[in-house]
Amino acid sequence: MAFTLKAASDQHLAFARSLTHQAMGHYYRQYDLTWSDKGFDTAWAGRENWLICQEDKLVGFVSLSRDDNALYIRELHMLEDFRRQGAGSWVLEQMFAKARAESRGYLRLTVFKTNPAKRLYQRQGLSIVGEEGCFWRMESVCLSAQSSR
């Protein structure tokens, strides 16, 4: 089944917050971090947010930010029933294409060190380039539009 991205709006904030808290709560507890609804809401308001859909079903979301050199994936979460079905790989492909189309030099993200999604990111071409406490910083050079990632 095909996946699509649809622009998210403020009406999707509660879904995204709940999904992120559910998906990341284990890591917050593992690393003794404090979850903040207000912090999530503030971050959501300052980012470009996309819903991940499969046919007419909302299955996840991706949240982005940018600087002059890079497109950053700030959040990428899927509902439990839709994980390991190719959506994450598809979203990463879309984000590589977006970064190239915007002439960004890099696609970057951070991931909890114990999050198995790190393997997906590595399979898709991102490499660990540093660490910050409990996070790996990962990136991939985004080649020109004429290149095939």
Would you name each region that the model predicts?
Residues Y121-Q122, L126:
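Conserved active-site tyrosine of GNAT-family acetyltransferases
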Residues A99-F112:
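Conserved GNAT acetyl-CoA-binding A-motif
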Residues F3, A7-D81, L92-K98, A117, ...:
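Acetyl-CoA-dependent GNAT
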